[in-house]
Amino acid sequence: MMNNNNLQHNQFFTIEQDFSPEKITDAERLVMECFSHIYANWADEKNLSREAEELRVGEIKGFKNILLSPWTLSDVTIEWDYWESVLRHRYKTQNGDGYVQIIWDRRGWLTDLLCVMKPVTRAEALTVCKWLLACDYFEERDSLFDCIILNLVGECEE
């Protein structure tokens, strides 16, 4: 059963029928309002160093203080698909370099959640497993894929 927080999250991270690559989504707008100093010139050489990367990731923390957080693994997959769709549109038009980095940063945080957030039910674990198998992103990332699968089935002693 979906609680009100799930519903709010999933409605917020839904691609609208009239979505266009030129339009900045509400989620992107919220992030830029808080972190424009980080993303305005993110492609500058000084911002591409490992130190700058670590500072940025440490400061943003997946934007969990400004964007709705997923409550279940199903919510994580819904949001992942949302960002995947936005990313496809951004690359198609090459619109907004800083916005592409926002997407990668949020997806990195969502990926961490896939590795640690426990499924609510066996049915959810199975649904997320099927989603994972269909998601191209995880194809060449064996250790990450394994980590998520172990989270879904529960780790056992050898």
Task: List PLM regions with ranges.
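Sequence/structural signature of long amphipathic alpha-helices
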Residues: 1-158
